[in-house]
Amino acid sequence: MTEDNKKQRLIWIDLEMTGLEPDENHIIEVATIVTDAQLNTLAEGPVIAVHQPQKHLDRMDDWNVKTHTGSGLVERVKESQHDERKAAAETIEFLRQYIDAGVSPMCGNSICQDRRFLAKHMPELEAFFHYRNLDVSTLKELAKRWNPEVANSFKKSGAHEALADIRESIAELQHYREHFFSK
C-alpha cells in the first residue's frame, strides 16, 4: 500500500457510555474499525469493555440500565480489567498498525458526542484523530430534508453495541453514497 493510500484511511469509533454528560457519566465500551477511502473494512479493533466502579453504574438512568444490562455489557464492565487509560492505550496500539496519528477524521454517527467523552476521559485517544469529523448523522439529517425516501430506506437495528453500531454507520454511509450522491 502506498503512503498516499494509507493517508486516506478512515478510523471509525463508537463508545457506549453510562449517560450523555461527559462531566457526570463514563465510557463503558470502545470499539474501532479502520476502512480504506472506499469504506472497505481493513481491520476491526479490539472491543473493550471499560471497567467502572459500581457507583458509576448505579447512576445510569433506566434506559441505559435496560439497554446495557440486556446486551450483557454491564456484566462485561464489572468483569473488565481495562480502565479508561488501558483501553485507550490498547486502542491506539491497534490503530498505529494501520494509520498515523492526526491523519483520520473521527468517523461515526453523532460523533461529536463520542469526541466529547474522549476529550474528557480518554484524551490520548481523542488526540490520535484529526480535528475534523466525518459524521454520518449529518448526511442523515440532510437526506431527511432533501430526499426523505433515501433517509427512510435505511433501517438501523439500534443494537447499542459499539462494534455493531460502527458496522451500521459504515453501511449507512455506503447507502448514502449510493442513493444520495449523484455521480
Swiss-Prot record:
Q: Which GO terms describe its molecular function?
A: 3'-5'-RNA exonuclease activity; nucleic acid binding
**Could you state one GO cellular component term attached to this entry?**
cytoplasm
Q: Which domain of life is it from?
A: Bacteria
Residue ranges annotated as transmembrane are: none
Exonuclease domain span: 10-173
InterPro entries associated with the record = Exonuclease_RNaseT/DNA_pol3, Oligoribonuclease, RNaseH-like_sf, RNaseH_sf
What UniProt keywords apply to this chain's record, in alphabetical order? Cytoplasm, Exonuclease, Hydrolase, Nuclease
The annotated active site, in chain numbering, is Y131
Q: What is its EC number?
A: 3.1.15.-
Where does this one sit in the cell? Cytoplasm
| GO biological process, alphabetically ordered | DNA metabolic process
Cited SUPFAM superfamilies: Ribonuclease H-like
Family statement: Belongs to the oligoribonuclease family.
**Role this protein plays:** 3'-to-5' exoribonuclease specific for small oligoribonucleotides.
Please identify the protein, giving its name as recorded.
Oligoribonuclease
Which source organism does the UniProt entry give? Idiomarina loihiensis (strain ATCC BAA-735 / DSM 15497 / L2-TR)
**Organismal lineage:** Bacteria, Pseudomonadati, Pseudomonadota, Gammaproteobacteria, Alteromonadales
